[in-house]
From Swiss-Prot:
Top-level EC class as recorded in UniProt: hydrolase
Assigned GO CC terms: cytoplasm
Protein name: Mini-ribonuclease 3
Protein's cellular compartments: Cytoplasm
Gene this protein is translated from: mrnC
UniProt cross-references to InterPro entries, sorted A to Z: Mini3_fam, RNase_III_dom, RNase_III_sf
Species whose genome carries this gene: Thermosynechococcus vestitus (strain NIES-2133 / IAM M-273 / BP-1)
Pfam family, one: Ribonuclease_3
Length: 151
């Protein structure tokens, strides 16, 4: 099992997270999340194009919103509040994504940015939950693709 705390060794800035606007937390959380996903799919070794396809599939707003739905039951009230602040601060997203989905993804990113800055151990726990969930999704999708279709 990957220890994401060791893989994300950067020291957070000394700016208290509560002084950052939710959009800034989301901006930062987006980078933290993409690094997590890239690390998650780094093994087994594969071609760069395959890495890219996997990462893009999981950093899309639709995936982030789905993962936030999964995490909701594990979130504390403070974490839910940070999510709501990020969701409510979301600007208009790309036209290809429904506004509700984009706002949920922004809230998800704000939560990850907040946790990175305030509680790296909790972020590690969230990433472990997500890693298990994502691997399960990928495995189920792989098995479904390998199963012969019934006609």
């Amino acid at each position: 099992m990957l220890d994401f705390g060791e893989l994300l060794p950067l020291q957070p800035p000394t700016i208290p997270a509560h002084q950052l606007p939710p959009a800034a937390l989301a901006y930062f959380g987006d980078a933290v999340y993409e690094l997590f996903i890239r690390l998650l799919f780094l093994t087994p070794p594969q071609r760069i194009n395959a890495y890219h396809r996997q990462v893009v599939a999981h950093v899309r707003a639709e995936s982030q919103a789905r993962y936030m739905d999964f995490l909701w039951e594990y979130c504390t009230e403070t974490e839910r509040s940070i999510f709501r602040q990020g969701r409510n601060a979301a600007a208009d997203g790309p036209k290809r994504v429904a506004a509700k989905i984009y706002r949920q993804a922004t809230g998800f990113e704000a939560l990850l940015g907040y946790l990175y800055l305030t509680n790296p151990q909790r972020l590690q726990e969230i990433f472990q939950l997500l890693a298990g969930h994502i691997r399960s999704e990928v495995e189920n999708k792989t098995h479904a693709a390998e199963s012969p279709s019934e006609m």
